[in-house]
Swiss-Prot record:
The gene is yunD. InterPro entries: 5'-Nucleotdase_C, 5'-Nucleotdase_C_sf, 5_nucleotidase/apyrase, Metallo-depent_PP-like, Pesterase_YunD. Its cofactor is a divalent metal cation. A divalent metal cation 2 binds at D48, N81, H179, H202. This is Uncharacterized metallophosphoesterase YunD.
């Protein structure tokens, strides 16, 4: 007998709550439709639901996000890197204490080799027709960062293979909730064809009709709640097999309904968060300014805080990381979150004088200062002018109309080509293609769990 099963999935919401009332309304409507047709519906979130750029998430350390998932009555969730590495250890350990759904992640452990109390390596769901589905889950293994936060994360592919051996005889269908990114998910599909469907995330791909790799269906719904994905599986309950599987997405911009209850809940959470973040951390005698394309007070203050916190020779901060000024008077946690919402940590690296000079020259180029940045934890608009503490950078605009770095000195002396210098930077400089010499530095020390705004609060309070 042929029957239909639907898996609705969200991924990488990043606390863009403006779309959540639509998502709730859409899924609730679809549940009712399928229920009236006698068809089963399951709902999953594939991680990075939370993002501390949003002040409600900041104030609750993500517990408001879990409340939203509870209220939607989802059937399971994976965790993303925003859940995994942007929360202090004790906050992640307690994040899902009140979750009313299984949190499925097989490759995360504490330092004693135990899973978090809320984690399961897989979840088996029995369907009304007698068939069963095994749901597996993995998260992207940022090894040094998890280690710094007191966790152990293991190789995702090996973990999947181990879990497959456990569930193979227990389930008719195998679905992987993966927060690895599309390239890794394609590799998983090639290596583990026993998987029927991968609900994927992390790299924010929109797979409007899914993608089939080695017989495995990959499905992903982009980011920020712009879309909700749906995998439709037609099964033969007598043969206990899959007849067909397809993927589609619903654009939330085209969905007009909204959940009034969800909007009211979010409004209440915003009021609570504003009150919780209203504590003053410092008092300013006068306004503190920021200018993205010239040296200004707040980025410089952060540069000095970074150098002092990391105990380095030098620090470098892009002015665009500060999103606005601070007014004279009390400075609250909410004020600092408003001007520096990024989930970005300090990092200390070691560079030779030659590498440092090349990096500074690169940062001073108009192309870098004007660069629009997306991702890497950055929640602003533009890179902006690089400012420094501990090193003096002299520049001059020459006849070619380009600003050139003419001299770099440390304590009045030219930096030495082969000497090693410790440099405090933003962790986003160690990722991607922004600063290859920083990214490829052999020595890196991450300072966690503090974010840049925590360093600003510490420095302002001095």
């Amino acid at each position: 007998m042929k029957e239909k099963l639907r898996l609705y999935h969200t991924n990488d919401l990043h606390s863009h709550f403006e779309n959540w009332p639509k998502i709730v309304d859409y899924i609730e409507q679809k549940r009712k439709e399928h229920q009236s047709d006698g068809e089963e519906t399951l709902v999953f979130d594939i991680g990075d639901h939370l993002d501390r750029f949003q002040f409600v998430t900041e104030a609750t350390f993500g517990k408001a996000n879990v409340d939203l998932l509870n209220r939607l009555h989802i059937d399971g969730a994976a965790i993303g890197n925003n859940e995994g590495i942007t929360l202090p250890h004790e906050e992640l350990a307690a994040l899902y204490d009140h979750a009313e759904f299984p949190v499925i992640v097989s490759n995360l452990f504490d330092k004693n080799g135990n899973r978090p109390s809320w984690a399961v390596p897989y979840h088996i769901k029995s369907l009304k027709n007698g068939m069963s589905i095994a749901f597996l889950g993995v998260t992207v293994p940022y090894y040094p960062v998890y280690d710094k936060l007191g966790w152990t994360v293991t190789d995702a592919l090996e973990s999947i293979k181990e879990t497959i051996l456990e569930v193979k005889g227990q389930a008719d269908i195998i679905v992987l909730l993966s927060h690895l990114g599309i390239l890794d998910d394609q590799a998983v599909a090639e290596a583990v064809p026993e998987i029927d469907v991968i609900l994927e995330s992390h790299t924010h791909h929109l797979l409007e009709d899914g993608q089939v790799v080695n017989g495995v269906l990959l499905a992903s719904a982009e980011k920020y709640g712009h879309y909700v994905g749906c995998v439709e599986i037609t099964v033969d309950s007598v043969q206990r097999s899959i007849n067909s599987k397809t993927a589609s997405v619903q654009n939330m911009a085209e969905w007009t309904g909204e959940s009034a209850e969800t909007k009211a809940f979010l409004n209440e959470k915003e009021r609570e968060a504003e009150e919780k973040l209203s504590d003053a951390v410092a008092e300013l005698a006068q306004d503190a300014e920021v200018k993205w394309f010239e040296e200004s007070e707040l980025p410089l203050l952060l540069a000095y805080a970074l150098k002092e916190w990391c105990e380095t020779d030098i620090s470098m901060v892009n002015s665009g990381v500060i999103l606005g000024p601070l007014k004279a008077g009390p400075v609250t946690k909410l004020d600092l979150h408003r001007i520096c919402p990024h989930p970005i940590n300090p990092v200390a690296v070691r560079l030779t004088g030659e590498e440092l000079k090349e990096t500074i020259v690169h940062a001073a180029s108009e192309q870098m200062e004007q660069l629009r940045i997306k991702g890497l934890g950055f929640r602003g608009e533009v890179m902006g002018k690089m400012v420094y503490a501990g090193v003096e950078v002299e520049t001059k605009r020459l006849d070619d109309g380009i600003t050139h770095v003419t001299r770099i000195t440390l304590n009045g002396e030219d930096i030495e080509k082969h000497k090693q210098y410790s440099v405090a930077v933003l962790d986003m400089f160690t990722l991607g293609k922004l600063f290859p010499l920083i990214r490829d530095a052999a020595e890196k020390e991450y300072f966690m769990p503090e974010f840049l705004r925590d360093l600003l609060a510490w420095k302002l309070a001095q």
